Amino acid sequence: MSIRIIPQDELGSSEKRTADMIPPLLFPRLKNLYNRRAERLRELAENNPLGDYLRFAALIAHAQEVVLYDHPLEMDLTTRIKEASAQGKPPLDIHVLPRDKHWQKLLMALIAELKPEMSGPALAVIENLEKASTQELEDMASALFASDFSSVSSDKAPFIWAALSLYWAQMANLIPGKARAEYGEQRQYCPVCGSMPVSSMVQIGTTQGLRYLHCNLCETEWHVVRVKCSNCEQSGKLHYWSLDDEQAAIKAESCDDCGTYLKILYQEKEPKVEAVADDLASLVLDARMEQEGYARSSINPFLFPGEGE
């Protein structure tokens, strides 16, 4: 099954009135998203060997919250939604959607917000980005979207991605339409922007027990059934790993068919789990999975592969 977004004027009357039994798509809920992430990162930093980096990531997440409200986006996506629906493509496809100057405006605002909090190498990195030309910034953005991580240093990538993510999340939040689950391919990618997940979460509340993958760019979540590989959709050779016990709130789901893994966070075990923060704070589990010979099928927005990785 894949997910397609249907324009408002193409919805049937029943689709306008009622929601699907299982919502295939959860658009980003931007209110307090970044503050909640920052708080969770700071909480997880306590007694964590990666504490300093988690606090660094929390500073970026908090800056995203500030910039989100200081620089709102106004955009009519109606035409774009119709075109993408007709083509069966993600409406905010990172590989084809033209970027306007708004994302670079967001980057400069993030840098201004972060400067007083940064020192040493981190300050030098954002000052370097501040001096970069418009074209240089566009080239780095294009390289990240093409997974050409050797062209963007791993210390610059989180700042570039933070601005791009804000921009794409703002656009996703403006999408007029409704998602419909249909037969198709490439369920492992975000149906809104085509980017990769950061992790998956088994939720509580109105979506109790359902698993949703969380986009590492536009913050959208999309439904993928449990006990099925999110990367290749096979189900015969899955294994579940944790550092604690069977009741752990964070597990890695590995697949011997494709050789990859993705983390699953369980809200019923820990209601405060957050897709980005808890993934970043559990890198010890990633190290274990690498030792077992599995490759990660996701990317955390605060941790990009360096050259040669």
From Swiss-Prot:
Similarity annotation: Belongs to the FdhE family.
GO process annotations (BP): protein maturation
Keyword annotations from UniProtKB, A to Z: Cytoplasm
Compartmental location: Cytoplasm
Organism whose genome encodes this protein: Escherichia coli O1:K1 / APEC
GO molecular function: ferric iron binding
HAMAP family for this protein: FdeH
Cellular component GO terms held in the UniProt record: cytosol
InterPro entries associated with the record: FdhE-like_sf (IPR024064), FdhE_C (IPR056796), FdhE_central (IPR056797), FdhE_N (IPR056774), Formate_DH_accessory (IPR006452)
Keyword Cytoplasm: yes
Entry protein name: Protein FdhE
Biological function: Necessary for formate dehydrogenase activity.
Tree of life domain: Bacteria
